[in-house]
A protein has these predicted regions:
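A detector of tandem-repeat and repeat-rich interaction/domain scaffolds
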Residues: 112-154
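Extended acidic/polar alpha-helical scaffold segments
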Residues: 1-119
């Protein structure tokens, strides 16, 4: 069914995301389903019209980087979407610039941030000591990590 569907610049999906992307993430976080956001963005990226979808393609790429970079903050404190995540996003981030007007007025000076996203996509969290070993499952969908704290996380 997805093969017959495509999204493109300034269509309903793109306009919805330009207005409500942060609200959508906040809602998913509040109902405990933030982890589904990455898969949803991936699905949208897969159905972009390659000719008429360059702007939505850049938006979704930036959106995915934004989610991956600030996942733990959004998951634990969804309202930080409107302050901490926006002001610490790279200066040229499409999400930061699209939703800059959501930054609270009480933030008088924004920190100096990188211009672009760096190479870090995601960090492992949850171990209390050095991680000494990591391995992917055979289907590449899971990652296991072993730590000096005598724990294994999947």
């Amino acid at each position: 069914m997805l093969a017959s569907i495509s999204i493109y610049d300034d269509d309903q999906v793109h306009n919805f995301l330009k207005c409500h992307f942060l609200h959508w993430l906040e809602s998913l976080s509040l109902i405990g389903r933030l982890q589904e956001s990455i898969g949803m963005v991936d699905t949208l990226m897969a159905i972009i019209d390659q000719i008429k979808g360059s702007e939505i393609s850049r938006f979704l790429y930036d959106a995915k980087r934004f989610i991956l970079s600030y996942y733990s903050i959004i998951d634990s404190s969804p309202l930080q979407l409107y302050s901490s995540t926006l002001i610490f996003a790279p200066q040229r981030s499409i999400i930061r610039n699209t939703f800059h007007n959501y930054t609270p007025d009480w933030i008088l000076q924004e920190p100096n941030t990188d211009l672009e996203w760096n190479a870090v996509l995601q960090t492992l969290e949850g171990h209390s000591d050095w991680v000494r070993s990591v391995a992917f499952s055979t289907d590449s969908k899971l990652l296991a990590s072993a730590s000096d704290d005598s724990t294994i996380k999947i």
